[in-house]
Amino acid sequence: MEINSFSFVLEPSYKKDGSLHSWEILTKNIFKKNANDYQANEMPFSFDALNEKEIIDAFNKQLLTIEKLEGFHLKFPLLSLNVDSLISDYILTDKYVSEHIKRKNNIALEINENFHEFKSLNCMSDLKKLSRLGPLWLDDFGGGLTSLKVIELFKFECVK
């Protein structure tokens, strides 16, 4: 089913001193076209309900939302985008998207706790490539595949 619109929110993250550290852009709702059943548009949103194309579409809409926010000339600190293995592959294989992110100085990529490279802990080549585009943060440390070994092997700029 085709997606009609998205609803995003900005969730603040604060430093120890109480000052604003960053904003995380989160997808709160997705409204599908021609959906007339309760589950399609009225249930609480979950990325698990989306297929790969829809997940990539949501990510692209997040990038466009950041562009719109920049048009208001607000003084935003970093804005973080959640990145799982699918989105990582998309970023690294789409030259336009990777260059777009690299040109921005206000986007951090927040790596999902179940990221595929955390399984083997070898060379972490995808993380190295992503780090050339901007700051990398580790999301939900302690959950999923994250461990002390992960943060020993790769220097994240922020661990949440």
What are these regions (language model features)?
Residues 1-102:
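Bacterial c-di-GMP phosphodiesterase EAL domain
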